[in-house]
């Protein structure tokens, strides 16, 4: 008999995930079907999104090996039935207050930063780069963790040193770039470009650095089809692209600059987004989503 979710105390909630306390050493990390865009959590969920994020994280924790926060299998008996397939039993960690971002291509906030300063997070880059340009080498572009509803703010490596100290800052940078490099090669073998990814780490009671939260999902990473890649234009991606395009297009009637929340998503955008998430999982993992637990 599996426990009820009500039997665990709710510890914290973010845009997409919720944390519950299992015991002194373990947490239940639950991925919801909520979707966020432009710093808003939308009122319309995407069916199966939480399961895809969980399946993708479990897959890549396995590929990467090393020290991660998993403390049970995806069907662990401590996971309640109502969240089976989108929840994981994880170790309780002291989370590092830095979003660890690796970029191999220039897009998003990195492109904005580059266009203003010629650098990203203080890392100088060559002149003449454009949307989706491949960088000479992947770079570490950390961000400070923002409160719910606020923007993560890109920060320099020196700012990370001030936050956590030199030794830990160097390890965060090195581990982030190592993981990005291995995952990028893995995706490339499957015809997919990993443009960038965001990782989070925590410290265990012994002070060891542990890979935590989600890893290499369509929410934390930009995946582009390698077929048709061309620098200088926005690439199609395996994530919330349909949602973003609809919200900023005339059909939604929503003004991004206003204080009003985004409108509900139409059914066709919901289904297209669901299919895109599942396609990302299946193409990258080589597994069938139909076989995932839950």
Swiss-Prot record:
Known catalytic reactions: 5-amino-1-(5-phospho-D-ribosyl)imidazole-4-carboxylate + L-aspartate + ATP = (2S)-2-[5-amino-1-(5-phospho-beta-D-ribosyl)imidazole-4-carboxamido]succinate + ADP + phosphate + 2 H(+)
EC number: 6.3.2.6
Pathway given in the UniProt record: Purine metabolism; IMP biosynthesis via de novo pathway; 5-amino-1-(5-phospho-D-ribosyl)imidazole-4-carboxamide from 5-amino-1-(5-phospho-D-ribosyl)imidazole-4-carboxylate: step 1/2
GO cellular component: cytoplasm
Keywords from the named record: ATP-binding, Ligase, Nucleotide-binding, Purine biosynthesis
Pfam families (UniProt xref): SAICAR_synt (PF01259)
Top EC category: ligase
Gene Ontology molecular function: any one: phosphoribosylaminoimidazolesuccinocarboxamide synthase activity
GO terms classed as biological process: 'de novo' IMP biosynthetic process
Keyword Ligase recorded: yes
Family to which the UniProt record says this protein belongs: Belongs to the SAICAR synthetase family.
Name of this protein: Phosphoribosylaminoimidazole-succinocarboxamide synthase
